């Protein structure tokens, strides 16, 4: 990937959800909701605080995260879709 986020922004690749129900019914793309989980692909250097010092981000590359349904700006890079969002749009890190 050839994109480097600036400041407190991160690049997230959505994690694909199961397209089949427990009973075996296949959910078409048009009816499926977009997943609200993703993996951090790249992180910016951080945001300057009021004192002028850069506050590094809490998330790191490889973290699995939760975010809001409408968080981020979708971008396509080499045919793959990613989200660019601010760290504050991330609700939590999935651990374990």
From Swiss-Prot:
It is found in: Cytoplasm. Its main location: cytoplasm. PROSITE patterns: CHAPERONINS_CPN10 (PS00681). SUPFAM superfamilies: GroES-like (SSF50129). Keywords: Chaperone, Cytoplasm. It comes from the Bacteria. GO terms for cellular component: cytoplasm. Gene3D superfamilies: GroES chaperonin (2.30.33.40). The keyword Cytoplasm applies. HAMAP family: CH10. Heptamer of 7 subunits arranged in a ring. Interacts with the chaperonin GroEL. NCBIfam families: PRK00364.1-2, PRK00364.1-5, PRK00364.2-2, PRK00364.2-4, PRK00364.2-5. Together with the chaperonin GroEL, plays an essential role in assisting protein folding. The GroEL-GroES system forms a nano-cage that allows encapsulation of the non-native substrate proteins and provides a physical environment optimized to promote and accelerate protein folding. GroES binds to the apical surface of the GroEL ring, thereby capping the opening of the GroEL channel. This is Co-chaperonin GroES. It comes from Nitrosomonas eutropha (strain DSM 101675 / C91 / Nm57). The gene is groES.
